[in-house]
């Protein structure tokens, strides 16, 4: 799965710094929410992403949450593999899957899953619960269905992963730290066929804004969260 195929090519880097530099040349999974806009509460607005990719911003230093998430990722991935012995879970460090159809779109998955003849993406998250209202909005049952939610910015990211890979499903595997210190593991599964309309819409938005601002070298407007 970490091999060149008709859908994507695989680029491997010698260091994390080299990988970070390569991310300036296109749209990565963590950029997707910024392209969608402030309604999905991205970590950065599109102007900040534009400045990052143009080399106009200072390198971002790890904060405590980022370091914790990166340290927990291999442990979470191993836990998931143990909990799902019928699945093969693979991972390759400092690599990038690049879409053949749209080379400006790439993805660095936390893992890839083989389940019989189905291929999936593994996405690992850590989440600190601060308020009950926000937790219910991000992870609770939707008011109009029996489906459980995930944060909007994570949903944009997994859609982006499906666009690049063409895979059948995504698993979001999250370690939640509650305000009293106890932990909870959450799994959310999404089949590609359930999100086809969302995939088309994200592709349209990403391609339109990539051409309008990044290819044309036009500074995007400041979006207020």
Predicted region positions:
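Extended hydrophobic/Leu-rich segments
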Residues: 2, 13, 19, 195, ...
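Short intrinsically disordered terminal tails
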Residues: 1, 224-225
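Generic low-complexity segments that are intrinsically disordered, proline-rich and/or Lys/Arg-biased
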Residues: 7, 86, 221-222
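Nucleic-acid nuclease catalytic cores
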Residues: 66, 82-109, 113-214
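Residue patterns forming the tRNA-binding/recognition surfaces of aminoacyl-tRNA synthetases
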Residues: 213-224
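Inter-domain linker/hinge segments that demarcate the starts of reverse transcriptase
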Residues: 71-75, 79
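Generic structural marker for isolated residues within well-ordered, non-membrane alpha-helices
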Residues: 47, 77, 158
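Charged, glycine-rich intrinsically disordered N-terminal tails and low-complexity linkers that flank
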Residues: 1-71
């Amino acid at each position: 799965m970490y091999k060149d195929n008709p859908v994507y090519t695989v680029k491997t880097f010698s260091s994390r710094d080299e990988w970070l530099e390569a991310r300036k040349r296109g749209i990565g999974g963590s950029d997707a929410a910024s392209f969608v806009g402030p309604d999905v509460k991205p970590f950065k607005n599109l102007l900040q992403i534009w400045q990052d990719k143009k080399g106009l911003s200072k390198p971002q230093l790890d904060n405590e949450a980022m370091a914790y998430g990166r340290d927990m990722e291999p442990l979470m991935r191993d836990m998931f593999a143990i909990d799902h012995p019928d699945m093969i879970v693979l991972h390759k460090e400092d690599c990038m899957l690049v879409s053949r159809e749209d080379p400006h779109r790439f993805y660095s998955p936390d893992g890839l899953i083989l389940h019989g003849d189905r291929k999936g993406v593994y996405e690992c998250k850590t989440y600190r619960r601060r308020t009950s209202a926000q937790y219910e909005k991000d992870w609770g049952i939707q008011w109009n269905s029996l489906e459980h939610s995930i944060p909007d910015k994570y949903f944009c990211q997994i859609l982006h992963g499906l666009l690049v890979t063409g895979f059948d499903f995504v698993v979001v595997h999250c370690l939640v730290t509650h305000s009293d210190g106890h932990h909870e593991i959450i799994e959310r599964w999404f089949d590609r066929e359930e999100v086809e309309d969302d995939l088309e819409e994200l592709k349209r938005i990403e391609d339109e804004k990539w051409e309008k601002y990044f290819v044309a070298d036009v500074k995007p407007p400041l979006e207020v969260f």
